């Protein structure tokens, strides 16, 4: 197996040395280059293209955002953002510009360096699973969420007096690459959709609320972080809180959400399997499962149960997903499903959730 070449970009010499030393100790990493800002990093990329980059965002001369914009136009290379927990908005902005994932600088951990090392081990393992096609692909995916919603979105998103129960519920699972893909998907959803959406995006605590707020600005569907026993409403999406799991439960006025601790032995949190299994139990053929990009097999067991109970299962085409693991696991589990590119997924969800499909 070929050794990976890494580039560490950070204006702090201490951070550069620390991250480089940790990467140098990992199996599979053969060489680590260093750069103190975006301009220097671009020169390194031109001279010796790395297999992946760890990137600080706040730097002099050419900051991380400008660097990402130039890099994705010239040399699409996997970028992992290294940022503090207080910089959540910046992290999601970087993901929209093309970064594939992030790791949080540990401040309050008992053993912060060990926490950082564990995250780096996970991310380096991820690099080898990335789809080259997805990395070369559509740079128009660098979507801006800072703009106000379109006129059409503003019109249909005006608050209503009554929350209508949805005809169907779309449950979505995603991991690495998910935030960017979800932005694309939500921009192509239709305002006549007779459904609610519940999203299990693998993400640590304290990040999911910011993600929900940014996703809320993308189009016609309102988005918020899921709350305990919140009743599902048509035209609304709910993001599972980081570090917790969400299950769909029955109520006297339609399906609702229960925020719970992960099941014993759950490796991925928020758990896609836990969400999908609850949707299968409560909703049966009124549930639609969607498995997007991500490492591992979370969602495969839940998709099998959902399909067994009559629900539809859609997966992002593994060949074009940033990380094929999760959708590929559904395919290998012999679950009845449809495999579509991200543009096709939006259209298919619209077809399955039309009011006349009830």
Q: What is each residue range found by the language model?
A:
Residues 1-7, 12-28, 34, 39-47, ...:
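Conserved acid/base catalytic micro-environments in cytosolic active-site loops
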